[in-house]
A protein has these predicted regions:
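Sec-dependent N-terminal signal peptides
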Residues: 3-12
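N-terminal signal peptide c-region/cleavage motif recognized by signal peptidases
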Residues: 13-18
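Extended, charged catalytic domains and RNA/DNA-binding interfaces, predominantly
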Residues: 19-231
C-alpha cells in the first residue's frame, strides 16, 4: 500500500512539475557586439549585424580576418546588443573613408551632416539642447548623438532583426547595451532587449548614459516606452 501510494505521489508530483515548469531548453547569446560598437570596431571587428544573424543561424560567414566560420549547431535566439553610446560612429567614419557609396547613402549623409554641425562654431544652441548634440572635443563621441544619424542606425538595427526573426524557429531580439561610465570600479552594463518588432522600437531612440548614467532613469525610459507603444 505504501509502495503504491509513494508511486502515485511521485508520478503526480512529476506531472505537476512538468506543467508548472517548462522543460524546453533554448540556446542563444544575449551579448553580441558588431562593428557598430566602438570597442568591437577598435579591436578589428568589421562585420555588421547581418553577419551576426547569419552566423547565429548556422550559416557560414567570412570573419574580419578573412577566415570562414560556422557554428556546429545553430542558435535558437540572439540579441545583437551594440553599445548605445556612439553606436555606429566608428563604423561610419571608416566607411566614409573606404566606401565611396557610403557617402551617398542616407546614413552617410546623416553622418556628414553631424560632422558639419560640429565643425560650425556658430551652431544653433537650440539644436544642441533639443537634439541631444552635446558640446565636447571628440567629434566621434558627439556625432552619433545627432538625432537623424542615431535614428537611422537604430532603424537599420531593427530592420535587420525583423528580417531574420522567424517565430518558432529563430528569434532575433532587437536590443542594445546601456553602458554607464565606470563608477567605483563597476561598469554595471545592462543589455536591453525588446520583445517587439521594429514598428514599435523605431518610435524611440536607445536611452544611453549620455542621457543619464543612473539606472533608475533607464527603468523610467522603459516604462515610458511601454506606455507609448504598448510593447
Amino acid at each position: 500500500m505504501k509502495s503504491a501510494l509513494f508511486t502515485f505521489l511521485i508520478g503526480w508530483s512529476l506531472s505537476t512539475l512538468a506543467v508548472e515548469h517548462p522543460t524546453d531548453v533554448y540556446w542563444g547569446d544575449t551579448h553580441v557586439h558588431t562593428a557598430l560598437s566602438g570597442d568591437a570596431f577598435a579591436n578589428g571587428t568589421r562585420l555588421e549585424p547581418l553577419s551576426a544573424y547569419q552566423f547565429a543561424r548556422g550559416e557560414e560567414v567570412k570573419t574580419s580576418t578573412g577566415q570562414t566560420a560556422r557554428l556546429t549547431r545553430s542558435l535558437d535566439f540572439i540579441v545583437v546588443a551594440d553599445h548605445g553610446n556612439n553606436i555606429g560612429a566608428a563604423y561610419s567614419r571608416h566607411e566614409l573613408e573606404d566606401n565611396p557609396d557610403f557617402r551617398d547613402s542616407k546614413l552617410g549623409k546623416a553622418w556628414l551632416a553631424a560632422r558639419l554641425a560640429l565643425a560650425n562654431g556658430h551652431i544653433d544652441e537650440k539644436a544642441l539642447t533639443e537634439g541631444s548634440l552635446l558640446p565636447a572635443h571628440r567629434s566621434w563621441q558627439i556625432s552619433v548623438r545627432y538625432p537623424l544619424f542615431r535614428s537611422l542606425v537604430w532603424e537599420r538595427i531593427g530592420e535587420i532583426a525583423d528580417q531574420f526573426n522567424e517565430p518558432g524557429r529563430f528569434t532575433a531580439f532587437i536590443g542594445y547595451e546601456w553602458t554607464p561610465s565606470f563608477e567605483e570600479g563597476r561598469a554595471e552594463h545592462r543589455v536591453i532587449l525588446f520583445r517587439d518588432s521594429a514598428s514599435l522600437t523605431d518610435q524611440v531612440l536607445p536611452f544611453t548614459s549620455y542621457d543619464s548614467a543612473h539606472v533608475e532613469d533607464l527603468w523610467s525610459f522603459l516604462s515610458r516606452y511601454e506606455a507609448k507603444t504598448g510593447g
